[in-house]
């Protein structure tokens, strides 16, 4: 496994630089400036602490590999991605699961990040437990920043119990009716004509909720719903064959043309944060989180 020292040396302290993960969302945020050096983050699981529900892993590790390993411990991390997506890449793009309403967002997963800053020096944000809040806000800034504030090498993530079972149903119930019969459904998605519900948890609880929904006219699906990527900034007018999350307002679609509109105040704040972290603009130059 590549060490943090080797990772730091590759990044240096002067050239334009970017970390490439699985490349599954590589064009998100705009093209890189020509001449940018491409490096890779350390790969591999460093340490599991299932009793404390944390795992320490190289940011270049495939998310699917980590999730497969955690299955044996009956745990998971609340991140989503493609088969080739890396842990660091999923954090950098803020790839929350369609189950976000139940299991939390990507920004809730990252407890500690061992990073290299724009000055070419290592620093640590956050800590291995939530009680240690020093630098924890920096972790939340790093998620969805597209690597424009710092480059993550090793991360400590919060894990959670993996549900015993999960079931997809579809029908024409509205959200209010579903909420009356389900306690914290994992997903309630709408494609413009039908509603799709994913319930998960202990088997007895899921079977009870499933029976209620079937009684109200919903039918069990024989396979999991195929959900396209989360498109930040998209609205219900941008479905284009995708899905609207009725619980969070998120849109999942293969249409990548959505533009995120932010207020001038938010943009000024974003620019000020970027200036403080990377005054020369050498980290992922050309990328814009908004």
Where do the language-model regions lie?
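A common structural junction motif
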Residues: 73-77, 180-186, 211-220, 243
């Amino acid at each position: 496994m590549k060490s943090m020292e080797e990772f730091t040396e590759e990044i240096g302290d002067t050239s334009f630089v970017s970390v490439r993960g699985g490349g599954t969302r590589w064009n998100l945020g705009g093209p890189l400036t020509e001449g940018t050096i491409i490096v890779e983050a350390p790969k591999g699981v460093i340490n599991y602490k299932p009793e404390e529900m944390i795992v320490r892993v190289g940011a270049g590790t495939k998310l699917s590999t980590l999730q497969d390993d955690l299955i044996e411990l009956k745990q998971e991390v609340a991140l989503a991605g493609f088969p080739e997506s890396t842990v660091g890449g999923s954090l950098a793009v803020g790839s929350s699961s369609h189950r976000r309403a139940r299991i939390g967002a990507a920004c809730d997963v990252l407890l500690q990040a061992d990073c290299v800053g724009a000055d070419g020096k290592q620093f640590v944000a956050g800590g291995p437990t939530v009680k240690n809040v020093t630098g924890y806000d920096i972790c939340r800034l790093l998620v969805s920043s597209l690597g424009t504030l710092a480059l993550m090498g090793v991360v400590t993530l919060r894990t959670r119990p993996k549900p015993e079972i999960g079931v997809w149903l579809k029908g024409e119930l509205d959200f209010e009716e579903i909420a009356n019969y389900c306690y914290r459904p994992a997903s309630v998605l709408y494609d413009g004509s039908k509603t799709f519900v994913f319930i998960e948890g202990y088997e007895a609880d899921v079977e009870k909720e499933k029976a209620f929904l079937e009684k109200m006219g919903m039918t069990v699906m024989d396979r999991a719903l195929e959900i396209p990527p989360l498109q930040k900034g998209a609205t219900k007018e941008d479905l284009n064959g995708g899905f609207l999350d009725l619980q969070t307002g998120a849109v999942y679609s293969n249409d990548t043309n959505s533009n995120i509109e932010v207020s001038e105040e938010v943009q000024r704040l974003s620019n000020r944060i970027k200036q403080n972290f990377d005054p020369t603009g050498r980290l992922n130059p050309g990328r814009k989180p908004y």
